Amino acid sequence: MSSVVVVGTQWGDEGKGKITDFLSENAEAIARYQGGNNAGHTIKFDGVTYKLHLIPSGIFYKEKISVIGNGMVVDPKALVEELKYLHDKGVDTSNLRISNRAHIILPYHIRIDEADEERKGANKIGTTKKGIGPAYMDKAARVGIRIIDLLDKETFKEKLEHNLGEKNRLLERFYELEGFKLEDILEEYYDYGQQFKEYVCDTSVVLNDALDDGKRVLFEGAQGVMLDIDQGTYPFVTSSNPIAGGVTIGSGVGPSKINHVVGVAKAYTTRVGDGPFPTELFDSIGDTIREVGHEYGTTTGRPRRVGWFDSVVVRHARRVSGLTDLSLTLLDVLTGIETLKICVAYKLDGKTITEFPASLKDLARCEPVYEELPGWTEDITGVTSLDDLPVNCRHYMERIAQLTGVQVSMFSVGPDRAQTHVIKSVWRLA
């Protein structure tokens, strides 16, 4: 039995999809455990670029099981569209398994999400307006509708009818928007469920059976630790738990069955949406990194905010997710920058702090304390091992490992799978 969890250590968009895809080669089951179609990941497979939002990146290996876990919120319409997108590209999806316990996103969740962001104005969270938050709210309020409910028309109608009474009052009286009619949703969404019912099962059983049979299971997180609802920059967070602890809740696999946790970190830092960002760059270096790194959201197309590598953030991720390994991505983007900076601590009201503050008011006042390192000019996109990297690049990686307290076990120097390199296997048994 061997299991690996892949988590983002920053604010998402760290390259988790690419690393998950790479590690999938040695896994026999790949599972997502939280989030929904608010997270996009881009994967290159056999020279073709794919953009996925819901379906795990292991879908391209037809002999491996790909799991949408119970902790996810699934937009049935988006799922059907994504399946069609894959089928149109000739991808076999018979290896997909969808948890019957996962909650679904309905049109009223999306409308409420949009209206709420609009209402907040300058205080908006910066959501993707995909209905994720409102769906998780319904789950916590015990009025959510699950996949298993969607497949039973009578149950679906009963729950939908009950929810529409409340949602329409909210939309019409509070947001002054038009509500929904039962018939607007019932037939269309029941039909979506029928289109993917062949994949629906108890995925906790599937995953535990795989682990008990000695198979390798990979758990794929969405977003990142700093977007975790408990450990992130609240309230500028997502509505679920991307940290490694979210695996046990969102997949139905106990913590004793988790072996390694791989934290994926960019060689710099990015963020989409609002909220404090201590190392953010507003100069030409920031613009260069954004353009060279193609730092635009997979889901929204929004330009990402760019900053220097922040070891305070990644240390926080190490602690709350129990990181055993680090995978450093997009090193090639930093090529040509004469002097690189790493944030080693923050200055808050004249005092040096080395741990990430819980208060956003404090975080907004934090000034980064930087350590400067010489950059490199050599093209590193074609390297095949750690030894091929320029000395300054290796020093940069070593310093990140020292400052974060996590060994760098993998690094990536480009978008293709062949540009991801292993220093130490994360599938090791010890």
Curated annotation (Swiss-Prot):
Q: Does the keyword Metal-binding apply?
A: yes
Q: Name where it's found.
A: Cytoplasm
Q: Where does GTP bind?
A: 12-18, 40-42, 304, 330-332, 412-414
* EC number(s) reported in the record: 6.3.4.4
| Main subcellular location of this protein, as a coarse class | cytoplasm
Q: What does the UniProt cofactor note say? A: Binds 1 Mg(2+) ion per subunit.
Its family remark reads:
Belongs to the adenylosuccinate synthetase family.
Which cofactors?
Answer: Mg(2+)
Supply the name of the protein.
Adenylosuccinate synthetase
> Which residues span the membrane?
none
Enzyme class per UniProt: ligase
CDD domains linked: AdSS (cd03108)
Q: How does it assemble?
A: Homodimer.
Magnesium as a keyword?
yes
Function as written in the Swiss-Prot or TrEMBL entry? Plays an important role in the de novo pathway of purine nucleotide biosynthesis. Catalyzes the first committed step in the biosynthesis of AMP from IMP.
